[in-house]
Every structure is written in C-alpha cells, then in structure tokens.
Curated annotation (Swiss-Prot):
InterPro entries according to UniProt: 6-PGluconate_DH-like_C_sf (IPR008927), 6PGD_dom2 (IPR013328), Mannitol_1_phos_5_DH (IPR023028), Mannitol_DH (IPR000669), Mannitol_DH_C (IPR013118), Mannitol_DH_CS (IPR023027), Mannitol_DH_N (IPR013131), NAD(P)-bd_dom_sf (IPR036291)
Chain's gene name: mtlD
The organism of origin for this protein: Pectobacterium carotovorum subsp. carotovorum (strain PC1)
Pfam family, one: Mannitol_dh_C
Name of the protein in its database record: Mannitol-1-phosphate 5-dehydrogenase
Single GO MF annotation: mannitol-1-phosphate 5-dehydrogenase activity
This enzyme's EC code(s): 1.1.1.17
Length: 382
C-alpha cells in the first residue's frame, strides 16, 4: 500500500507517519521545509522517542519526501492508495491545489482503484472541509469521477507532540507521549478501509470528535491560558498548580456533562477519561510551553471550537458553565508577541472593549448573560 502524508512536522512524523510506517505502508512525506525534506531523503529514517512510564526509542525506516507543491507530489497522488494530512487547519486550503491536480492526473490515467484521503487535524470534520477546497479547484468533468472513486474520510486524532527541544541537533528526532488515538469515520471510505493498527473505525465519529474537542482540547487550552496568567512556563507546571487544576478539571466536567447528555457516554468512564487527560498533562517528559499551546486564540474562541462550543452545549441543556467561563476570560488575556492572532486579539480588546470583542470573535450575543459573566471574570483578572 502506498501513502502520501502532507506535513512532515513533529505530528506528521511522530504520530500518523509512524502508524503508517509501522503498518508497512510505503510512505512519502510532503512538506515545504526543504532542510527537512533533504534530511528525510538522505537518511530515509528517523527516531521517535516515546515517553511515559517507560521511555523507548523507535526507528521509522524506508521513508522518502517530496515538496508539497511539486509535480512529484501530484504524481504520487495519482498512484497512492491513501493520502493523509497533519498540516494545521489553516494550511488545508493551501495543499488542496496539489491534491486536485493529482486527482485530475489519476482520472486522466484511467485509474479506478479507490483512493482515500484523511485529514488528521485538530478540527471538526477537517476532511470534509478539505474536500470542499479540492472540489472547487477541479476542472469541469472531473468532480463526478472524484466523488465516485475517492473517499474523503473524517477523523479525530489525539496525541500530544510538543516541539523539538531547543539544542537538539537532529532535525528529524521527535518526542511523543505513549497515548495515541486515531478514530476514522468508516462510513466515508471508498472501497474497503485499510487495515492499519492504531486506526480505529467508527460509525459515530461526531461523538468521538466532540469528546476529544470538549475534553483534551478544552482542558489543554484552559491550562495554557490560566497557566500564563499564573506565570507558569509549561503545561505540567500549570496543571500541578491546585488553583489552575481545579478550574481545568471543573471545565472538563462541565463540557463532559454536555457529552453525556448528547451522546449517552457513561459518566464513570468519562470521569476516568478526564483523569487520564489530567495525568497526560502532568507527564514530566513532555516540556510543552503554555505560550505554544495557547496560540491562535481567535480560532480557539470561535463558535465551533474548544471553548465556545462546549459553552453553547451547556446553554442548550441548561447545565453549569462557571469554569468554562473562567477559561474563556483567561483566553481573552492571552498574549504572545510571536502569535499574530494574539496581537489581533489585544488590538480588538483595546479598540472595542471586552464585551464587543468577545461577541465578535465568538458569535455570542453581546447582550447575553454569558458574555456579561465572561467580561466580569475578565475584568477581575486584570
């Protein structure tokens, strides 16, 4: 089986790429980082450090790499069985052109073997969004063929992969936690789903997408934002602060109550899932900076993301949300000179004030009780 994976960064190499290589898939990475591509092509392998109760080093072998915008990438799409991505939500639109060209070539070559495309991104139904970008770019006469011969398969992914530590002289080495979860929508495949250990099939993907978004992502973001407020450097430092931990756990319990109501998750099992995530945040081997985890606050405060979406669920089911509100207020205080969204957030708050700014970013009614609550907590944090 041949696969092309867009995104040779830490998540691509340490998570999806590793699972594919472990399944003996013939794997090529596509990226725009030329030094990374050169290193992959000269060495054909890299190491993954898996940290937890026991630390081990795995070697991923027999890999190659091409530039994301190259004709080599187009040619690979024309012959691949699987295309996966881990590029970040905002980059999906940028790789859609290469994918569209590859699908046109595949059609013109007369290939009828199924191709499945899976976006493995921190977003809800990312592959469906990628599909829309691709379909828009297809010339007339190709769309119908693509719909018939290509599966666009949504997924939920979960593995903490921090950036490479400063001072590491190996551009390809990557550190990941032991835990990983890759759940895909089995109803969207074209042909039979591939057998890849570590890839779980479900016909109820949204339950797992929201479970991850409302728990791991919600908790991670609030830990980062409260951690920065409390002057902590890392996620571990922040979650070991009892005040931060109480709010983070409380917020995950509030969002969890929405999941239990909406999808019928077992309350005891979900409580165990929350505790598992808290222990993952405490992992002493993962040096994950609160500033990194908190970046892109405008996206994280948008209506469909990890802070506002669970809050909307609590409003829908008339459930408590005080800790989620605290997390939202802390997100509004997030600052980073390196993050354009943080700079834009600060400017919005300066120009409009917290009430109008939060309403604009989140889509919440400026005159609603929850916005008033968030503004009160925000002001109290000054």
């Amino acid at each position: 089986m041949k696969a092309l994976h867009f995104g040779a960064g830490n998540i691509g190499r340490g998570f999806i790429g590793k699972l594919l290589a472990d399944a003996n898939v013939e794997l090529t990475f596509a990226d725009v980082n030329q030094p990374l591509l050169d290193a992959l092509n000269s060495r054909k392998s890299y190491t993954v450090r898996i940290v937890g109760d026991n630390t081990r080093l795995d070697t991923v072998s027999n890999v190659s790499a091409v530039h994301s915008g190259s004709q080599d990438a187009v040619a690979l799409i024309a012959v691949a069985d699987l295309v996966t991505t881990a590029v970040g939500p905002q980059i999906l639109e940028k790789i859609a052109g290469t994918i569209a060209q590859g699908l046109v070539k595949r059609h013109n070559d007369g290939t009828t073997r199924p191709l499945n495309i899976i976006a493995c991104e921190n977003m809800v139904r990312g592959t469906s969004q990628l599909k829309q970008h691709v379909l828009k770019l297809l010339p007339e006469g190709h769309q119908e063929w693509v719909v018939e011969h290509v599966g666009f398969v949504d997924s939920a992914v979960d593995r903490i992969v921090p950036p490479s530590e400063a001072g590491s002289d190996d551009v390809l080495a990557v550190t990941v936690e032991t835990f990983s979860e890759w759940i895909v929508d089995k109803t969207q495949f074209c042909g039979e789903p591939p057998a890849i250990p570590g890839m779980e099939l479900t016909d109820n993907l949204m339950a797992f997408v929201e479970r991850k978004l409302f728990t791991l992502n919600t908790g991670h973001a609030i830990t980062a934002y409260l951690g920065q407020q409390a002057r902590h450097q890392t996620i571990r430092d922040a979650i070991l602060d009892p005040k931060v931990r109480a709010v983070v756990k409380g917020a995950m319990e509030e969002s969890g109550a929405v999941l239990i109501k909406r999808y019928g998750f077992d309350a005891d099992k979900h409580a165990a899932y929350i505790n598992k995530i808290l222990s993952r945040f405490e992992n002493p081997h993962l040096h994950d900076d609160v500033e990194r985890v908190g970046r892109q606050p405008l996206r994280k405060l948008s209506a469909g993301d990890r802070l506002i979406k669970p809050l909307l669920g609590t409003l829908e089911y008339h459930l408590p949300h005080d800790n989620l509100i605290t997390g939202i207020a802390a997100a509004m205080h997030y600052r980073s000179e390196q993050d354009p969204q943080a700079l834009e957030l600060a400017e919005l708050l300066r120009a409009q004030g917290p009430q109008a700014a939060l309403a604009q970013i989140s889509g919440l009614d400026a005159d609603s009780e929850v916005v008033a609550q968030a503004v009160n907590v925000y002001n109290a944090m000054q």
